[in-house]
Amino acid sequence: MDNICELFDEILPLIIEYLSDHDKVKFMTTCSRLYYFIDKVYYENIYDYNKIYHLEFTERFKRIRFCAINESIPSVITDLTLDREFTGSLGNCKFPRLTYIKLSQSQYDTNKNYIPSNIEIDIPNPFKNFHLTEFDMSKLFDDSYYIFSGTYMGSSSWYSTKTILRSRNFLSYYWNLDIVNYDRLESPEPESQENFRPIFPTESNNNKPVNKSQPQIKKSRSQKKFDKFYYQKKIVSNNNKRPKSFMKYRR
């Protein structure tokens, strides 16, 4: 019977090693007999030292990470990260199990003589998160009445996203108005002195009879008022002077 128990104690740890770390813990916590093997097997995953330092079998963890801010670094650490505010020197520390270290370029220049050659060194690039965006300044000034917003610059299809904010300066105000060329109004050309409204089929053209064979457009009373307001004659005097009551109608 004793031989069977000894055989059980030798074979069962070998079987447990094929399980994942999560399954190992679940299996060995099912009963007190199996819990005996909890410090007899190895754990493959990487664990934080601050969460397992109270255990008596920390040497059973194959990978243990630690972030150091001073020289007090445990000897069981395998993955070491030096904090930005790390003070001290690695020359006073011993790392029998260290396989990986992460530090800045300045920290590496200070402690490179104390790092063994068989250790993997990770030095992050501080400029890897920066990127340059090139753009044509001429496109920016093409539409000066727009404000550069987000990813849109100008009215052209330079970017797909068209986020437009109108400028509140005086240029945008006068740009959006229908500006009248008063110089031309003061000395109008002969062909521009008379502006006639369009002639509809229901109306007479120079007192000529309307051809009733053509289809006539029936308009409502509101539509007739609309046409009367927007298509009335604009009277411009012939004395080359702008009338006082001049007004430009627009839709």
Curated annotation (Swiss-Prot):
Region (Disordered): 188-251
Comp. bias intervals (Basic residues): 241-251
Alphabetized InterPro entries for the sequence: F-box_dom
Pfam families associated with the record: F-box (PF00646)
Domain F-box: 1-46
Disulfide-bond pairs as recorded: none
Compositionally biased tracts (Polar residues): 202-217
Record's protein name: Putative F-box protein L166
